[in-house]
Amino acid sequence: MKILYIGTVTNNEWYEEMVLTSSSQPSAAPQTFENTLLRGIKNNGFENIEWLTFPMIAAYPKSRFLYWGKEKQILDCGVQTTFIPAINLKGIKMFSQLISSRNLIKKWLEENRNEAEVCVLMYSIYGPIAKNVVNLCRKYNRKCVAFVPDLPEHMYMAKKGIGKFVSRFYVASVKKIQGKFSGYIYLTDAMHERISNTKPYIVVEGLADEEIFAPQPKDGKKSSVVMYAGAVSKTFGVDRLTEGFRKSNIDAQLHIYGSGEYVGELKAICLKDERIKYMGRVSHSEILQKEREAELLLNLRNPSDDFTKYSFPSKTMEYMASGTPVLTTRLEGIPEEYFKYCYSVNDNNVDTVKNELEKIFSLSPTERKELGERAKSFIKDNKTGEIQAGRILNFLESLF
């Protein structure tokens, strides 16, 4: 089997520089997820694969990139990817990607015309490129598989002005092609009902990079810090998390890392309550270290939000791999097996958060530590990038 992988992943150093020089910052989750996936494929000993990247860069002038050509990069997992060229201007970017991706995909399919088993694996159903993947694979009678991290209607949610109209048009265009792949890789089982309920699929809710399984602090001591890392947004319940902590009587600080629309309000709260610290956006390696040092990690999205049924919070797996205990809401998108290894609540109401924090901190440090270590072992034994990538490769083989 030969694979062409098309995704958004870039070199980490280049990615961090791009983020720092852009006024509109992308989510770090896909970068982490894809790096782990590709490293997992490599660790499975699979080598018949080539890579293309459509980087998630804000349109000029929100980023400094006006154009990029067929730039080649060595990714952190050691493989080389080629950028799909684009003119990075609103209204032109997608059209330029439509043209350039068609040429690159067609060239690869032509080069592998005589191979028996050929598959194009695409991360995210990104309209301009996905259209070419589907049409060209049909023309050459090849398999194409989509890795679906989010439903299109949840990824593009502009709420006002011309952006709202463009978002609706874009989502409608993606829905026309989303059911035309040969197979799918979903984060949750419920996603197949919204994308394609007739095609083969596999559920891979997440994967953990082997590199994040570092030991706990040598002295065994934890800092008295409750921590959240991710999008600093009301959509993800950071406002309720913050207020629940403020009302609690626990002897700890709350440290929040990331960026988002709630940052302004959060900074104002920090001035009123010295226990709460906004730490900004830092490198992923620093986040991993802080997660290992913390006393408790929080991820408290609202279970009543529709999107939580169709998404698995990638931070949940990263948190659990740290060895630090985790408090999460019981989201439909999280498989039941995970809740045996973390603290959980049924909603993210302020009083619920307050009461659960006080309950957890009434437990002995030893009891909390044991839960964190059991969670780490669960992830390490079942959910590493290598294990999950092996499942994906087996699924792709099953399509032939």
Language model features with spans:
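N-terminal subdomain of nucleotide-sugar transferases
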Residues: M1-W68, E115, E243-N249, L331
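Donor nucleotide-sugar binding/catalytic pocket of nucleotide-sugar-dependent glycosyltransferases
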Residues: E153, S167, V171-P215, K277
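Nucleotide-activated donor-binding/catalytic signature segment of Leloir-type glycosyltransferases, i.e.
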Residues: G264-E291, L296
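Conserved acidic donor-binding segment of nucleotide-sugar-dependent glycosyltransferases
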Residues: Y341-D351, K359-P365
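A charged, aromatic-enriched C-terminal amphipathic alpha-helix characteristic of glycosyltransferases
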Residues: S362-E397
